[in-house]
């Protein structure tokens, strides 16, 4: 595994962690809360965002306007069955999701969930580093690179690992601040 490949994988891991953080509900409306909601549309699971316009008219409301009005009920059912934790209200034209304020206990739970996502991201980055170090050692063993080159590559790899784990830590601090803001 080359350094560029390892860095690319680490970058993707940071992005995946950011997406995971986006699914955590804070006290504010955010359309990305519905990213993982799949609607059983004509027998196939379809992402909600491809079936409806999702907007946030204010800080506590998400508005879902299906492109096909006949799909209102199945969209409402999919949201109810999802793990979003919000109750949809259907007025016949649009579906509204009101975001209730978070209790302090719920905020603590969400901080723990965010910390878990961050730890999963850090572990994934360390696994990428381990795989890259293994491939560097293999190259060194086969005399394809010198011992000095291998050491240099491992040092660069460690710097990348530190950089991307620090980025995940920054994202976690941001998310914790976001969750804790009343």
Curated annotation (Swiss-Prot):
* Superkingdom assignment: Bacteria
- Give the GO terms filed under biological process for this record: translational termination
Kindly name one Pfam family recorded for this protein. RRF
A GO molecular function annotation here is: ribosomal large subunit binding
Q: Major location, coarse class? A: cytoplasm
Where does the record say this protein resides? Cytoplasm
Q: Does the UniProt entry include the keyword Transport?
A: no
Would you name any one GO CC term?
cytoplasm
Q: Known SUPFAM superfamilies for this protein? A: Ribosome recycling factor, RRF (SSF55194)
Alphabetically sorted, this entry's keywords are: Cytoplasm, Protein biosynthesis
Q: Report the CDD domains cross-referenced here.
A: RRF
InterPro entries given in the database record: Ribosome_recyc_fac (IPR002661), Ribosome_recyc_fac_dom (IPR023584), RRF_sf (IPR036191)
Q: Which family does it belong to?
A: Belongs to the RRF family.
Purpose of the protein: Responsible for the release of ribosomes from messenger RNA at the termination of protein biosynthesis. May increase the efficiency of translation by recycling ribosomes from one round of translation to another.
Q: Could you tell me what this protein is called? A: Ribosome-recycling factor
Which gene name belongs to this protein? frr
């Amino acid at each position: 595994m080359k350094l560029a490949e390892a860095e690319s994988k680490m970058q993707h891991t940071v992005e995946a962690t950011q997406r995971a953080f986006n699914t955590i509900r804070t006290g504010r409306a955010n359309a990305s809360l519905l990213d993982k909601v799949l609607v059983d549309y004509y027998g196939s699971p379809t992402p909600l965002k491809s079936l409806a316009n999702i907007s946030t008219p204010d800080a506590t409301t998400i508005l879902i306007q299906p492109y096909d009005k006949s799909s209102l009920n199945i969209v409402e059912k999919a949201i109810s069955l999802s793990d979003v934790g919000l109750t949809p209200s259907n007025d016949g034209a649009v579906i509204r999701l009101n975001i209730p304020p978070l209790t302090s206990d719920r905020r603590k739970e969400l901080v723990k969930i965010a910390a878990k996502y961050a730890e999963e991201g850090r572990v994934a980055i360390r696994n990428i580093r381990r795989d890259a170090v293994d491939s560097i050692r293999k190259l060194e063993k086969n005399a394809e690179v010198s011992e000095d080159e291998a050491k240099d590559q491992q040092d660069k790899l460690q710097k990348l690992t530190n950089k991307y784990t620090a980025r995940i830590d920054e994202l976690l601090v941001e998310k914790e601040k976001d969750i804790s803001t009343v």
